[in-house]
Amino acid sequence: MTYPRFSEIARTFAPGWFAAVMGTGVLALTTRSLAQQWPLLALPAAALHWFNSALFVLLAVPWLTRWLRFPEAARQTLSHPVQANFYPTFSIALLVLAAQWLTFTDQVAVALVLWWLGVSLHFIFSFAVLFYMFRGEQVTIDHVTPANFIPAVGLVVMPLAGGPLLQYMDGALREWALTVNAIGLGAGSMMYLGLLGITLQRKFLHKPAHGLLTPTIWIHLAPIGVIPVSLMNLLEHLPLPAAREAALLLMLLFWGFGVWWLVMASLLTLAARAVGQLPFALSWWGFTFPLGAFVAESLHLSRLLGWRSAFFIGVAAWLLLGVLWLITLLRTARAVASGAVFTPHP
């Protein structure tokens, strides 16, 4: 086959590409966290940070080109009942990068710019995607997958970097940032509860999402891992000391659900693979960020409670994350080299 020209790549550029930035970023952050126990991990963690920053810039070129040169194609994807859910991976990637730059460098200004830009774009995408879905009649139970979590539930990612960044703000700016964090966490958490019920309804009462959408099973782990950590980050800056114990209990409950869902997602994925229902696609990056969110939650919980069991489960999940990330990266590189990954899906 003839390798596609850049204009064609940009015209059909899938919005889900930035799931690669999300997954690589969370691998960098969790590896850096483990470097506290094993200092040798500090160097690969830093390498992942810089690689991911470059990856975002590289992917942003065709993404922005599509909006500038092919706005009709971009808007058409925005109204697609499945593909539209992946547009907010761009804004979530910015929020993850903000956490990276705050963790790996002393460039607080860069982290702040990335965070505010990510916050602004994610609010826009969450309203735009859900507006089309709520107003349209094209969405059916066949279109319901955990990918529906991304636009609204992605709001809970804001306090991951937004909480720690509050110490670098003061006055009205700090109050507005705190307010934005609270809105994001509140809206995303409540939307997760509603969407969780809808996705479980499909699993119980309708045919499962196989094939290209098989990895979306793992997306459940993202809010399970992020919500408690974001809540703890926010409580660090609120005059609610008694709420920390309740938040810790909530984290424990979410973590328990996460352990259970990790096993279930693994079993469902292996079952799909056994019958040839796991073809490679960009959706494989959906394995990485959710699993990384669970790793971060496990390590956070182990530090707060002093539980070695949570730490070892987190390390085991981190090792699995590393394997899945490497496999997906290599398969993606091969697909990019052949041009196959730029063939649009219906």
Task: Annotate each PLM feature.
Residues 4-23, 76-84, 131-155, 184, ...:
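Cytoplasm-facing juxtamembrane segments at the starts of transmembrane helices
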Residues 254-257, 311-327:
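Small-residue-rich transmembrane alpha-helices that serve as helix-helix interface/gating elements
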Residues 26-33, 93-102, 156-168, 224-238, ...:
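Hydrophobic alpha-helical transmembrane segments in multi-pass integral membrane proteins
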Residues 37-39, 171-178, 237-247, 272-276, ...:
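Extracellular/periplasmic helix-loop-helix junctions in multi-pass membrane proteins
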Residues 75-83, 99-155, 160-185:
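Membrane-interface helix-loop-helix junctions at boundaries between adjacent transmembrane segments
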Residues 1-64:
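N-terminal signal-anchor module of multipass membrane proteins
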Residues 117, 151-265:
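Generic multipass alpha-helical transmembrane bundles of integral membrane proteins
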Residues 40-108:
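Membrane helical hairpin/interfacial module
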